[in-house]
A protein has these predicted regions:
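Conserved beta-strand elements of the Class I
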Residues: 33-34, 89-91, 132
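N-terminal small/polar loop signature for handling phosphorylated ligands or for N-terminal nucleophile
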Residues: 41-116, 227-238
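Short glycine/serine/threonine-rich phosphate/pyrophosphate-binding segments
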Residues: 17-20, 42-45, 72-73, 97-103, ...
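Active-site segments that bind and position negatively charged phosphate/pyrophosphate groups
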Residues: 200-327
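An N-terminal, well-structured beta->alpha segment
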Residues: 1-63
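A glycine/threonine-rich phosphate-anchoring loop and its flanking beta-alpha core
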Residues: 18, 110-206, 297-300, 304
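C-terminal charged capping/lid subdomain of soluble metabolic enzymes
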Residues: 308-383
Length: 383
């Protein structure tokens, strides 16, 4: 038997953010903690969300102290703000960082404790406080998944939480909220979405439904990501990417991820690098190794990226898929080496990051479990 998790209500398409007030009112909630970041708080996006809330008579208080790669302190401060203002539900507004912070705030609000208590698989006992998750980037799919990531500042580790009790009640994916996103952010989040779809397709946890979802996501990303990066106001491309992340999010939410994410989490935790960029740089490195172990799994990846696999060997399909991934990454402007991001090999703590990657919650989803030495070698390929 396979369990399939997805929010109960999912609003997708142009202008759907205008409907949130009526949905919240019908559900009987009164006051929201609106979790976001400083950029969105000062942008044109926030009024597009607060306007329908005001019209529906829904009260809210804005909590914008969420950093990129949200920390334990961000979460505990959010929990304090929620309690001080007597909020009975949460609205998360943003990309992966506000979404992840809101998920952890939700779980702690009903279960108590601290973020570290929930690292790992399904550690909470009670359903979290209701969350209306409004996404503003086409990448993480955090608005529809049971996964969230919080950085432990003291240990310099990204803690991966997989918890069905953190699942949002309502997800909102409105492409009109994404047109102002700059090209580098669009590229990074889009490559994160591609990583989700590819990892979910080749993981041993993949099954019929999730495989179809991953394939659809990969096809859409190849078609629409370059367009969205080239012209952020290409609303058709933005809508295509919204559809891609919804499909890919449903896939990895239920099939799992792999070692690309395990290694990328460490780069973000220690060096505060953009998660999507880290995933994009690592994706061909890890999938090249995965293809040696499970080459047949890459026939679907290659087909989704444009190859007719008829008459081709598994190895030929895998080589094509990895080359296409590298080409797409280059097309949208992703750096190839960590030195381009200001990280020098002589300063890189290979053993520390590699040891943490091996115990990351995403690692068991990979087609094979690398050794410490192999992981160090993978990181060395980024220099």
């Amino acid at each position: 038997m396979s369990t399939f998790y997805v929010p109960a209500i999912n609003l997708i398409g142009r202008g759907v953010v205008n409907e949130i007030g009526s949905y919240v009112k019908d559900l009987g909630y009164n006051k929201a903690l609106l979790v976001t970041d400083k950029f969105i708080q000062s942008s044109e996006i926030l009024p597009k969300v607060t306007k329908p809330l005001d019209e529906a008579g829904i009260d809210y208080v804005v909590f914008s102290d969420v950093e990129p790669n949200p920390t334990c302190k961000n979460v505990t401060d959010g929990v304090s703000a929620l309690k001080e203002n007597n909020c009975d539900f949460i609205i998360s507004l943003g990309g992966g960082s506000p979404q992840d912070a809101a998920s952890c705030i939700s779980v702690i609000a009903t279960n108590g404790g601290k973020p570290q208590d929930y690292e790992g698989l399904h550690k909470s006992a009670k359903k979290g406080l209701p969350v209306v998750a409004i996404n503003t980037t086409a990448g993480t799919s955090a608005e529809i998944t049971i996964n969230y990531v919080i950085t432990d500042e003291e240990r310099k580790v990204k803690m991966v939480m997989v918890d069905k009790n953190s699942l949002a009640l309502i997800s909102v994916n409105d492409p009109e909220l994404m047109v102002s996103k700059p090209a580098p952010l669009t590229a990074a989040t889009g490559m994160d979405a591609l990583t989700h779809a590819v990892e979910a397709l080749v993981t041993p946890g993949a099954y019929g439904v999730t495989k179809k979802l991953s394939i659809g996501a990969i096809e859409l990303i190849k078609e629409y990501l370059p367009r969205a990066v080239k012209d952020g106001h290409d609303i058709e491309a933005r809508e295509g990417m919204v559809n891609a992340i919804f499909l890919g999010g449903m896939s990895f939410n239920n099939a799992g991820l792999g070692y690309v994410h395990s290694m990328a989490h460490q780069l973000g935790a220690v060096y505060k690098l953009p998660h999507g960029v880290c995933c994009a740089m690592l994706l061909p490195v890890i999938e090249r190794e995965n293809a040696k172990r499970v080459p047949a799994a890459f026939r679907d990846v290659a087909k989704a990226l444009g190859l007719d696999p008829a008459g081709k060997t598994d190895e030929e399909c895998a080589a094509y898929a990895i080359k296409e991934i590298e080409t797409l990454s280059e097309t949208v402007g992703i750096p190839k080496k960590l030195t381009e991001l200001g990280i020098e090999e002589k300063d890189f703590d290979f053993e520390y990051l590699s040891k943490n990657a091996l115990i990351d919650a995403c690692a068991p989803g990979n087609p094979f479990m690398p050794t410490l030495e192999e992981t160090i070698a993978f990181y060395k390929e980024l220099f």
